[in-house]
């Protein structure tokens, strides 16, 4: 799946052309980054590349030797053994790249976005729905 996401999103180094590592969203990493950096808002980019997928996964926890961690394990040995625990979402068929408002987005897309906000304890203020500079949906005035 990582290779597919990388190709869909054109995730290659601008200078070196080296392929970037890609995978499903890990909300534990996002939540931790938001907490330690004092973030109040999130920007979700490249949401459009998920269009057409039947199912979309999101890492919500880790399994370490049968124990569930709802946060990034602080012990490096546990971190190396951690296996992702995923929540799975129904995808959407619609091409969202021309949509201009949150209300236009498919319901399954909105469900996915609401879950990100819920698990990260941080609101989403902007969504990128296409490759062009004007393919953004603003949800809060802060980033306009």
Predicted feature locations:
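Non-transmembrane, aqueous-exposed alpha-helical and coiled segments at domain scale
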Residues: 1-144
């Amino acid at each position: 799946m990582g290779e597919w996401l990388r190709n869909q999103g054109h995730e290659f180094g601008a200078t070196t052309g080296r392929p970037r590592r890609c995978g499903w969203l890990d909300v534990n990493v996002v939540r931790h980054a938001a907490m330690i950096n004092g973030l109040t808002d999130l920007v979700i980019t490249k949401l459009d590349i998920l269009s057409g997928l039947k199912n979309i996964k999101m890492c919500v926890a880790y399994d370490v030797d049968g124990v569930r961690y709802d946060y990034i394990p602080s012990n490096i040995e546990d971190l190396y053994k951690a296996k992702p625990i995923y929540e799975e979402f129904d995808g959407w068929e619609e091409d969202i790249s021309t949509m201009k408002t949150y209300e236009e987005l498919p319901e399954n897309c909105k469900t996915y976005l609401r879950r990100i906000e819920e698990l990260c304890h941080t609101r989403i203020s902007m969504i990128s729905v296409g490759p062009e500079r004007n393919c953004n949906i603003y949800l809060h005035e802060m980033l306009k």
